[in-house]
Curated annotation (Swiss-Prot):
It comes from Bordetella bronchiseptica (strain ATCC BAA-588 / NCTC 13252 / RB50) (Alcaligenes bronchisepticus). It is an enzyme of class 3 (hydrolase). It comes from the Bacteria. The keyword Metal-binding applies. Mg(2+) binds at residues 6, 8, 137. This is Putative 5'(3')-deoxyribonucleotidase. Keywords: Hydrolase, Magnesium, Metal-binding. Pfam families: NT5C. One of its GO terms (molecular function) is metal ion binding. Belongs to the 5'(3')-deoxyribonucleotidase family. One of its GO terms (biological process) is pyrimidine deoxyribonucleotide catabolic process. Its EC number is 3.1.3.-.
Length: 186
């Protein structure tokens, strides 16, 4: 089984790193709490006059590279490989890609090892990537093709209005994926 894992928000903890960076840069302006997020694009949760400040944080040199792993993500990645799954990291770089693309590779190398960089797929359109499952926090994924993969939503406050697909986090992933493996054998 070919499992595609999104990077930011699924493997790399974009959200909490952003909040920490916001507090350091703008201690006088309260950041939007993760639990209160409504939009997949973090800048959209801020007032128009603050969106440039938000964008400056996540496009800054080193931000993507230095993201901490989501708790449990590295262990789940390694366990899936040990179970014989073909696991790939399928990530969309930011439109402001100057730092992002290289830093995604550096993040994978730092947390999963140099060999894992060969498992990294960067694309603006995930519907063009082949796979059986895509685990992604983006609530709706559209593109040029009808994807072959089944979208499993990685749980986040901004995607909880989507109830038509399986949902997981790194605490319950075994149960959710066991159901998907059973389904694929049927």
């Amino acid at each position: 089984m070919l499992i595609l894992l999104d990077q930011d928000g699924v493997l790399a903890d974009f959200e909490h790193a952003f909040i920490d960076a916001w507090r350091k840069r703008h201690p006088d302006i309260e950041p939007v709490a993760f639990k209160d997020r409504k939009s997949f694009h973090i800048r959209e949760d801020y007032a128009p006059e603050l969106r440039g400040l938000a964008e400056a944080i996540y496009t800054a040199p080193g931000f993507i590279r230095d993201l901490p792993p989501v708790p449990g993500a590295i262990e789940a990645f390694r366990e899936l490989l040990a179970l014989g799954m073909d696991v790939r990291i399928c990530s969309s770089p930011l439109m402001q890609f100057e730092n992002c693309v290289a830093e995604k590779y550096l993040w994978v190398e730092r947390h999963l090892g140099r060999e894992a960089t060969q498992r990294l797929i960067l694309t603006r359109d995930k519907t063009l990537v082949q796979g059986d499952l895509l685990i992604d926090d983006r609530p709706v994924i559209t593109g040029a093709a009808r994807p072959r993969w089944r979208h499993i939503i990685y749980d986040a406050p901004y995607n909880r209005d989507q109830t038509d697909r399986p949902r997981l986090d790194w605490r319950n992933w075994r149960n959710v994926l066991a159901g998907e493996l059973y389904r694929s054998d049927a």
